[in-house]
UniProtKB/Swiss-Prot annotation:
GO BP term (any one): fatty acid metabolic process
Gene Ontology terms, MF aspect: lysophospholipase activity; palmitoyl-(protein) hydrolase activity
Disulfide cross-links: none
PANTHER family linked to this entry: ACYL-PROTEIN THIOESTERASE 2 (PTHR10655:SF13), LYSOPHOSPHOLIPASE-RELATED (PTHR10655)
Name the record gives this protein: Acyl-protein thioesterase 2
Catalytic site: 122 (charge relay system), 176 (charge relay system), 210 (charge relay system)
Organism: Mus musculus
Keyword Transcription listed: no
Reactions listed under catalytic activity: S-hexadecanoyl-L-cysteinyl-[protein] + H2O = L-cysteinyl-[protein] + hexadecanoate + H(+); prostaglandin E2 1-glyceryl ester + H2O = prostaglandin E2 + glycerol + H(+); 1-hexadecanoyl-sn-glycero-3-phosphocholine + H2O = sn-glycerol 3-phosphocholine + hexadecanoate + H(+); 1-octadecanoyl-sn-glycero-3-phosphocholine + H2O = octadecanoate + sn-glycerol 3-phosphocholine + H(+)
Length: 231
């Protein structure tokens, strides 16, 4: 990877999947609570596109209120997983700034914002939604898996003006016991007040719990192929 990664802490040890050809687009994908970027780098390598670079950073280890203050990889503190749970506003905003720094690093290395997709699973998906909607750079889109929109009461006012053109693929398991699918549906409803409604796809998967599935990964691949064609 060219460019100085020292000024972007999340890049120094991020798991990456390089493109087989010249990289003209990037997918930045954020893992869920307690995980690392490696598992999603492995999953994304199964649907890789030859001209796309996949970057899967690791969250810092912090005490998590929801898990009895145990220290684990977490993008921000979590107090609960319901639409009315208190939220770590300062932590969410700080995490979003760190992801924006990563986006800007890729832009400096020659990948334009409209060739960058931000995505994530669970807490990582939540952070990807918040970051992309408040980002000053017009990204191509968002892949939001099994997640929610943090600080949802701040939207649509908190969104950047260019956010209305974002394409969003939101996917959710219908049997998710951690982040219920109803929460996902409420999130999709909210997102349609922030971006052009037709740009939001909300797909649900019968029998799937708080995880991904082959059909979902196929939908992600199709979404990325349309948004990030070869140039």
């Amino acid at each position: 990877m060219c460019g100085n990664t020292m000024s972007v802490p999340l890049l120094t040890d991020a798991a990456t999947v390089s493109g087989a050809e010249r990289e003209t687009a990037a997918v930045i994908f954020l893992h869920g609570l307690g995980d690392t970027g490696h598992s999603w780098a492995d999953a994304l390598s199964t649907i890789r596109l030859p001209h796309v670079k996949y970057i899967c950073p690791h969250a810092p280890r912090i005490p998590v209120t929801l898990n009895m203050k145990m220290v684990m990889p977490s993008w921000f503190d979590l107090m609960g997983l319901s639409p009315d749970a208190p939220e770590d506003e300062a932590g969410i905003k700080k995490a979003a700034e760190n992801i924006k720094a990563l986006i800007e690093h890729e832009m400096k290395n020659g990948i334009p914002a409209n060739r960058i997709v931000l995505g994530g699973f669970s807490q990582g998906g939540a952070l990807s939604l918040y970051t992309a909607l408040t980002c000053p750079h017009p990204l191509a889109g968002i892949v939001a898996l099994s997640c929610w929109l943090p600080l949802h009461r701040n939207f649509p006012q908190a969104a950047n003006g260019s956010a209305k053109d974002l394409a969003i693929l939101q996917c959710h398991g219908e049997l998710d016991p951690m982040v219920p699918v109803r929460f996902g549906a409420l999130t999709a409803e909210k997102l349609r007040t922030v971006v052009t409604p037709a740009r939001v796809q909300f797909k649900t998967y019968p029998g799937v719990m708080h995880s991904s599935c082959p059909q979902e990964m196929a939908a992600v691949k199709e979404f990325l192929e349309k948004l990030l064609p070869p140039v």
